[in-house]
């Protein structure tokens, strides 16, 4: 699985998250008009109208935040009926309508699964339908079974159930560390493994910074001795996709010291000149 950035939809989602409440309804309607299909699919208009579980999960979160149950149910129905992998209880990460088999890649993307499960928990809290929380519990159970492992002294969530545990290392994506969701799962289940995952994720982030910016690369290798390095199969850089890292940290703890290098680096640029990526070698 080689994930491509979904910058158009991601950028709009980020703007929705930080839109003043008085404008949130209008922003949500604009977002739906641009990316939401009547069948419940979120399309990446900058990438051949493909869909990803991350986009579905984020949209489900936004539907809950906007008290839009009708849209939420369409999103969830399409996701569950089209992307669900019945063999492991997770979701195919990508849907490409141009292919004969739109879900040819049968791997999952753990961040998408996490976002979907988290949105379902929030849906139950808002609309008092235990069917949502039951579905969420099934997804989190599947994530623990297929994506969460203990490696080199850390509890980690692999980016996908296949292809990220190699002979002498595992590959991690720090932008998949959805801390507030992991905390919500811990509160829901009372399982310590979710708190361990969050704690170890923070420990790893403290050590992942490199280069002039002291920021982690998009993909990171963790070897059996606990050594961290940029993963070999990807460019050694931090791209726009990784802006999710400080977002999730801030959602979890707005005063976290882990935000310091992000503020220091991006604070030096005018908003219109924010770099799309940072090469750790420069």
Specify the residue positions occupied by each region the protein language model found:
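Active-site-adjacent structural elements in enzyme catalytic domains
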Residues: 74-78, 121-122, 134-142
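Short glycine/serine- and small hydrophobic-enriched flexible loop segments
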Residues: 60-65, 115-125, 180-184, 247-251
């Amino acid at each position: 699985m080689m994930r491509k950035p979904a910058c158009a939809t991601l950028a709009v989602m980020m703007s929705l998250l930080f839109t003043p409440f008085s404008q949130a309804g209008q922003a949500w309607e604009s977002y739906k008009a641009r990316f939401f299909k009547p069948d419940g699919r979120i399309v990446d208009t900058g990438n051949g109208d493909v869909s990803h579980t991350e986009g579905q999960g984020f949209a489900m979160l936004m539907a809950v935040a906007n008290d839009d149950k009708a849209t939420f149910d369409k999103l969830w129905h399409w996701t569950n009926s089209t992307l669900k992998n019945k063999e492991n209880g997770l979701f195919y990460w990508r849907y490409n309508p141009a292919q004969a088999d739109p879900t040819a890649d049968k791997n999952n993307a753990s961040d998408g699964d996490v976002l979907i499960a988290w949105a379902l928990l929030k849906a139950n809290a808002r609309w008092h339908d235990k069917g949502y929380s039951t579905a969420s519990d099934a997804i989190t159970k599947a994530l623990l079974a297929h994506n969460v492992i203990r490696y080199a002294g850390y509890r980690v969530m692999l980016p996908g159930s296949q292809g990220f545990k190699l002979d002498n290392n595992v590959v991690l994506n720090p932008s998949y560390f959805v801390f507030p969701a992991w905390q919500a799962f811990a509160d829901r289940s009372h399982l310590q493994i979710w708190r361990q995952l969050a704690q170890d994720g923070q420990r790893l982030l403290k050590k992942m910074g490199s280069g002039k910016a002291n920021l982690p690369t998009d993909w990171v290798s963790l070897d059996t001795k606990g050594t961290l390095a940029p993963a070999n199969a990807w460019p050694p850089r931090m791209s726009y996709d990784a802006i999710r890292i400080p977002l999730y940290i801030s959602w979890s703890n707005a005063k976290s010291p882990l935000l310091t290098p992000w503020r220091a680096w991006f604070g030096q640029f005018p908003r219109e000149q924010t770099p799309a990526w940072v090469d750790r070698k420069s």
